Regions:
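A recurrent flexible, glycine/aromatic-enriched loop bordering the glycosyltransferase active site
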Residues: 131-147
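Short, well-formed alpha-helical segments that are part of the catalytic scaffolds
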Residues: 10-28
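Conserved donor NDP-sugar-binding/catalytic core segment of glycosyltransferases
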Residues: 93-125
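The conserved acidic donor/metal-binding loop of glycosyltransferases
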Residues: 85-89
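Short beta-strand/loop segment that forms part of the nucleotide-sugar
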Residues: 30-39, 57-59
């Protein structure tokens, strides 16, 4: 498996400042689909010009987080998708660690990250733990979810 096996989907709504930091935390070799819940052509041009690996889809209006993610997921052509919030930042090793976990458990449905919320930002990283094979959870934080 390689980085070409993952597409990152980010639903946003007028989040230009936040999403810029998020996109800077993603290596430029990863494909990213940003579904912007507006019709802001200036936003689309700015994001796609600054981040060549990002395809911005304008929803035309605020369809909400779930519907915007579904639009993005329909465009994914890779084996895996990562739904990521526009205010999250990835640890540099996060996606590589995810691929390692995915290889060990190829029939997973969803993998969520370990989260470091001690700072003023949320730092996401994926590591194997004793709870990795957890089959049921009471809550999954939705700011980063890997889907198979």
């Amino acid at each position: 498996m390689s980085i070409k096996d993952i597409t990152i989907v980010i639903a946003s709504f007028k989040s230009e400042k936040k999403i810029s930091q998020c996109l800077k935390s993603i290596h430029s070799d990863y494909n990213v689909i940003n579904v912007e819940n507006s019709d802001d052509q200036i936003y689309k041009k700015k994001i796609e010009n600054e981040f060549k690996n990002v395809r911005c889809i304008l929803a035309g209006k605020n369809l909400g987080y779930g519907k915007a993610n579904n639009i993005g997921l329909k465009e994914v052509k890779t084996k895996y998708a990562l739904i990521l919030n526009p205010d999250a930042e990835l640890n540099p090793k996060a996606l590589g660690n995810f691929l390692t976990l995915a290889q060990k458990t190829p029939d997973f449905a969803l993998i969520g990250p370990n989260v470091d919320e001690n700072k003023k930002k949320t730092n996401l990283h994926f590591e194997e733990s004793e709870n990795f094979l957890l089959l049921k959870a009471n809550i999954v934080k939705g700011y980063a979810m890997f889907l198979n």
